[in-house]
């Protein structure tokens, strides 16, 4: 019997619109955007922040070292990154609905301290949840098995009593391998009824 609903956060309970954000800063300058993306994302900085191995200052230094000609633009990108995070209007009502059904609601997310501090307001749904795990807190990221075990150990959960949803199929596949039930999140309109049917 499922007693616990476990959510990913990014692009599930909160939208992370990086491409839209970058175009709002730099228009259609694809060379600039691709270079900054390379310096922040593809060299592993963002993933290292998610894992608690780097902070924002270290990411800035690394990205600037990769593309010193764009130092000003890289700093602007990181300074205004809060604008890439957007609330989902359905997040709090959904969590509240689960609570009314007598279920527990948790989060399990690849998320950095930098992102939490950049825009804490988009995480307001957490106040209505029973808890959760951010990857930076435990130095493990999905789909590493350790992060799923960390959630269960922290709250005394049995994996078979948990339903996990994430927009990344590999993360759901790993959750299932760890004993969770799982549904890939493919947008609220499509996935909400599937999850609620599985929970009832």
Predicted regions span which residues?
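Asp-based, Mg2+/Mn2+-dependent phosphohydrolase catalytic module
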Residues: 1-7, 112-113, 117-200
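Active-site neighborhood of HAD-like aspartate-dependent phosphohydrolases
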Residues: 1-41, 177-178, 187
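Generic structural signal for small/hydrophobic residues in well-ordered secondary structure
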Residues: 8-11, 52, 98, 107, ...
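Alpha-helical elements of Rossmann-like donor-binding domains used by nucleotide-donor carbohydrate transfer enzymes
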Residues: 20-21, 44, 58, 62, ...
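Hydrophobic alpha-helical core bundles mediating ligand binding, dimerization, or RNAP-core interactions
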Residues: 22, 40, 59-64, 78-81, ...
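Short, surface-exposed acidic
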Residues: 28-38, 67-79
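A metal-dependent, Asp-based hydrolase signature
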Residues: 46-77
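Short, acidic loop-to-helix structural element flanking the phosphoryl-transfer center
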Residues: 57, 74-106, 145, 188
């Amino acid at each position: 019997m499922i007693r616990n609903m476990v959510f990913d956060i990014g692009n599930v309970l909160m939208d992370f619109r990086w491409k839209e954000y970058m175009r709002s800063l730099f228009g259609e300058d694809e060379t600039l955007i691709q270079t900054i993306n390379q310096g922040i994302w593809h060299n592993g900085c963002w993933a290292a922040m998610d894992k608690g191995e780097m902070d924002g200052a270290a990411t800035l230094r690394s990205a600037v070292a990769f593309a010193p000609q764009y130092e000003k633009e890289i700093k602007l990108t990181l300074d205004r990154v809060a604008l890439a995070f957007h609330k989902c209007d359905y997040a709090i009502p959904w969590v509240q609905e689960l609570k009314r059904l007598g279920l527990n609601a948790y989060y399990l997310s690849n998320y950095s301290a930098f992102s939490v501090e950049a825009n804490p307001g988009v995480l307001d749904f957490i106040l209505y949840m029973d808890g959760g795990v951010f990857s930076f807190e435990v130095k493990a990221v999905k789909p590493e098995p350790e992060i799923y075990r960390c959630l269960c150990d922290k709250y005394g959960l049995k994996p078979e009593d948990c339903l996990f949803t994430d927009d990344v199929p590999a993360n759901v596949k790993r959750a299932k391998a760890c004993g969770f039930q799982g549904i890939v999140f493919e947008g609220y309109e499509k996935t909400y009824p599937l999850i609620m049917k599985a929970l009832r």
